[in-house]
Amino acid sequence: MAEVHPSAIVHEGTVLGEGVKVLEGAVVGKQPTLSPRSTAKREPLPPAVIGDGTVVSTGAIVFAGATLGARVIVGDQACVRERVAVADDVVIGRGALVENDTTIGARTRIQANAYVTAYSTLEEDVFVAPCVVTTNDNFMGRTEERLAAMKGPTIRRGARVGGGAILCPGIEVGEEAFVGAGAVVTKDVPAGKVVVGSPARVLRDVPEDELL
């Protein structure tokens, strides 16, 4: 049976699995309110689905159309937007924002105040450190051409992204790659490599004892 704090809001139709906890002031199943100028789709979204044993922490928001697997932790004041698919055993840290149409693989950890932009893919066992910023729009809001080209980064299995790094639109971080703190990633990162700097460049291989 799910536990919902009296101050939490769970919108009609939301599916809560066995042992789910929705803590103080959290909101689950919220339909988005769009700006008149928004290019996002406007049809009603299906209910949010929250898997067994998942915790939606104090002040967190999970929008309608989101699907969270089992044993997920959504930290205090974090936000998971519509059409996000989160696999089992994922941690979304305090104040992190996962934008719409994003996929997050099992056991991935997104730490406090990270920003995962819309149309991103994070595979299994990814680590995203605090205050990482991902982007998806090379045109920065100008021209209609941007709508067809809008794409967040793809972060492959076991890759790690250091604190404060910035990932530019559409780039791919390869399997088991390591992006150093504060790096600005403007092009694809090869699998198993360490990149640092602005713009990011390959420094060396990831040590074997750090590989999954």
Model-derived features with residue positions:
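Structural signal for interior beta-strand "rungs" in well-ordered beta-sheet cores
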Residues: 2-196, 201-202
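A glycine/serine/threonine-rich, flexible loop-to-helix segment
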Residues: 206-212
